[in-house]
A protein has these predicted regions:
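Cytoplasmic-side transmembrane-helix entry/capping segments in multi-pass membrane proteins
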Residues: 31-37, 80-88, 111, 137-144
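Active-site rim beta-loop-alpha module in soluble metabolic enzymes
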Residues: 125-161
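Hydrophobic core of alpha-helical transmembrane segments in multi-pass integral membrane proteins
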Residues: 9-21, 42-43, 111-127, 148-154
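C-terminal ends of transmembrane helices
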Residues: 17-28, 66-77, 124-133, 185-191
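Interfacial loop-to-transmembrane junctions
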Residues: 189-200
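Small-residue-rich segments of transmembrane alpha-helices in multi-pass membrane proteins
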Residues: 37-48, 86-97, 141-154, 203
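Helix-coil boundary and interhelical linker segments in multi-pass alpha-helical membrane proteins
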Residues: 1-5, 45-56, 96-109, 156-169
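Conserved small/polar residues in nucleotide/adenosyl-binding loops
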Residues: 201-207
């Protein structure tokens, strides 16, 4: 049984490598199915190794799978909206997991400082990209940007409360997600091209259980 559960992370590693190689080669016939398959395999790996699996983490990963599926057609506004909404709901699930599993005991000054830094970043990034984003998608894009910042801040605060490597990995995952979606936004709305970034948050958050 112990050997059997390693099938999932090994499969995930192989799948991730194949996906990255297909992105590098521009092979959409391989990139698209491997992208959609990533999150279910992450969920299986999480369930196999987590001491106390959380339904919220599993739900977040499955919403991520839906997001990946819809964003196979990112240049179509309807699918972009559905994909972004799916990821948004996934992040809500992650937030529920964070605030029901982590203890946060930090001075309010830290909360204000960290939040102010992220708020300033949102103002700068959104003000620069706003004109490139279709008007109908601007509210959703802003809400999603704020959600990514809330997720990142929500991972910093437990880390400041008590250091743990799992928290650090999850924080880096959220940071990769911010960077990945920044590239996605630039390619979609500025360069008008289909992006191929990988969602690292989904690969790192499950390490926390």
């Amino acid at each position: 049984m112990i050997v059997l559960k390693w099938v999932f992370p090994v499969s995930l590693a192989v799948l991730a490598i194949v996906h990255l190689v297909s992105c590098w080669r521009g092979d959409d016939d391989l990139r698209k199915p491997t992208k959609v398959a990533l999150m279910p395999v992450v969920a299986l790996s999480y369930l196999a190794f987590a001491r106390q699996p959380s339904i919220w983490v599993v739900a977040g990963l499955l919403f991520g799978c839906l997001g990946d599926l819809f964003l196979l057609w990112p240049l179509k506004k309807k699918f972009f909206a559905l994909g972004t909404s799916s990821f948004f709901l996934g992040h809500v699930c992650y937030l529920i997991f964070i605030y029901t599993h982590y203890v946060i005991r930090v001075s309010w000054i830290w909360i204000v400082v960290v939040s102010a830094i992220y708020a300033a970043g949102v103002v700068v990034v959104y003000s620069r990209s706003r004109k490139s984003i279709p008007r109908a998608l601007r509210p959703l894009s802003l809400m999603y940007m704020l959600m990514l910042c809330v997720l990142s801040v929500s991972l910093i605060l437990p880390l400041l409360t008590a250091f743990w490597w799992g928290k650090l990995v999850a924080f880096f995952g959220a940071t990769f997600f911010l960077a990945s979606d920044g590239v996605l936004c630039d390619m979609l709305f500025v360069k008008k091209a289909e992006p191929t970034p990988v969602s690292y948050t989904h690969l790192t958050l499950p390490t926390n259980s």
